[in-house]
Amino acid sequence: MSRYVFTSESVTEGHPDKICDQVSDAVLDALLAQDSSSRVACETVVNTGLCMITGEVTSKAQVDFIHLVRDVIREIGYSGARAGGFDANSCAVLVALDQQSPDIAQGVDEADDHEGDPLDKVGAGDQGIMFGYACNETPELMPLPISLAHRLSRRLAEVRHNGTLDYLLPDGKTQVSVVYENDKPVAIDTILISTQHTAEVAGLSDEQQVRERISDDLWTHVVEPATADLPLKPSKDSTRYLVNPTGKFVVGGPQGDAGLTGRKIIVDTYGGYARHGGGAFSGKDPTKVDRSAAYAARYVAKCLVAAGLAQRAEVQLSYAIGVAKPVSILVESFGTGKVSNAELTELVQQHFDLRPGAIIQQFKLREMPALSGGRFYRDTAAYGHFGRPDLKLPWEDVENKASTLLQAEASRLQQGNTL
């Protein structure tokens, strides 16, 4: 019997890097909502009293970027007397956006391998490799460690916003360690929560008393509600529970650490449980395959698992800049597939159109901001891009496609042919 512990982390929306991801995606939403053909590569930097957006944008949209940035920061919770050194109302906002390089634009606008099909005309915005993953550990077909870490982070933000724990401040991180036996989760080994807070908590100022009060409150108002519907639940008797291990966490957010777009790519995906191609998502329009192809790879992997063709599936895609069709497609089922990896790969090649133009069209990636009232990508920028029961994400809707795959495999077996 194999036994091991696997750990994943999440961060709250007030973490400096996540502020940047949300600002970058808010810029993307605003541009696409007005002009669905916008080309966007927006990077954000935050530090004490400063937020700067930079990158490349080609768009007909007219956006008040400074007002937009302040609104995002304010909604996260950095405003007023408790904002510290990063206040939405007074921080400097710098805008340094250029146009997209014409050398890149020509490859995206007119793919090298098009032969009359309009979808062949949309080439990949860059070369790269992308991975998608799914497994049957949770209802949303995500690994349990990252799923639980996100639950804790979302709940941590919720009790701050609704005033349940009014001493909490926006910055925070969670980490969950899960015990596996024979690749199945069997227990929650450790829960770690680091959360920013006011210097005084419920009339207490002694550091030890403050820490104990926060620990008790988080167990009652965060840990227990976040895990209430899980078959595996943490226990004070058997689960190691750590809160603010350094003792206190008063100085946080951009005042404590600078932030940058794209520095939480493992938090954004599978918590390290699956491989990652290295490309970030936030601030990038759908022609960037770092984003759109990673969404498609997740969709494919989730379809395979939802169809019962594998208990675990990892899908790798690769692209060349300016070329529409993927350079390669590979499925790995880690020995859990009902058929071989080669057969699963061929099934994917037959039933999924993974050209960037087709991905964009299927998931309406250019139209989603306008269809969602001007806010779509921004909501993916905190608490993960996959396995989000709180959001209606088109790449997570696999029921119909999974049924098609199951029927195709059943038909193949009936005919006695290989794929």
Curated annotation (Swiss-Prot):
Cofactor: Mg(2+); K(+)
Principal EC category: transferase
Any Pfam family matching the protein: S-AdoMet_synt_M
A GO cellular component annotation in the UniProt record: cytoplasm
List of residues binding Mg(2+): 17
Family designation: Belongs to the AdoMet synthase family.
Superkingdom assignment: Bacteria
Alphabetical UniProt keywords: ATP-binding, Cytoplasm, Magnesium, Metal-binding, Nucleotide-binding, One-carbon metabolism, Potassium, Transferase
Assembly notes: Homotetramer; dimer of dimers.
Keyword Nucleotide-binding: yes
Pathway: Amino-acid biosynthesis; S-adenosyl-L-methionine biosynthesis; S-adenosyl-L-methionine from L-methionine: step 1/1
Protein name: S-adenosylmethionine synthase
One MF annotation (Gene Ontology) recorded for this entry: methionine adenosyltransferase activity
UniProt-listed Enzyme Commission number(s): 2.5.1.6
InterPro entries: ADOMET_SYNTHASE_CS (IPR022631), S-AdoMet_synt_C (IPR022630), S-AdoMet_synt_central (IPR022629), S-AdoMet_synt_N (IPR022628), S-AdoMet_synthetase (IPR002133), S-AdoMet_synthetase_sfam (IPR022636)
Reaction equations catalysed: L-methionine + ATP + H2O = S-adenosyl-L-methionine + phosphate + diphosphate
Function: Catalyzes the formation of S-adenosylmethionine (AdoMet) from methionine and ATP. The overall synthetic reaction is composed of two sequential steps, AdoMet formation and the subsequent tripolyphosphate hydrolysis which occurs prior to release of AdoMet from the enzyme.
Protein residues bound to K(+): 43
UniProt entry tagged with the keyword Transmembrane helix: no
Protein species of origin: Synechococcus sp. (strain WH7803)
Main location: cytoplasm
CC cofactor note: Binds 2 divalent ions per subunit.
Chain intervals for the UniProt region annotation (Flexible loop): 100-110
Gene that encodes it: metK
Alphabetical GO biological process terms: one-carbon metabolic process; S-adenosylmethionine biosynthetic process
Binding residues annotated for ATP, in chain numbering: 15, 171-173, 248-249, 257, 263-264, 280, 284
